[in-house]
Amino acid sequence: MKDVYKRQVIDRPKGTAHPKYPDFIYPVDYGFLRDTASMDGAGIDVWAGSAGDQINAVMCIVDLLKRDSEIKILIGCTEAEISAIYQTHNETAYMKGILIRR
């Protein structure tokens, strides 16, 4: 578990704007796991919360604009952070996600 925590790269800190969609502000630190590959070829995405280094859940996402699906790992997220992440992935008609708790 500690290995996963050490491999996190947070490239979009909480409170920063998305590079392509400046109206979107990240509610929780967001990044990826170094030395991994997801379906889009980039590193596996992570939401890194404020409550430690335990994996809480995963979000399975379908993005109709990008025409892909992804899995995002939630690490150390509080209930409030999990709720904000869930809402983020379900607030538009173009992206939907399901939360799978550990």
Model region roles, listed by residue range:
Residues I25-A48:
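Compact, glycine-rich, soluble single-domain proteins
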Residues M1:
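Catalytic phosphate/metal-binding cores of nucleic-acid and nucleotide-processing enzymes, i.e., regions
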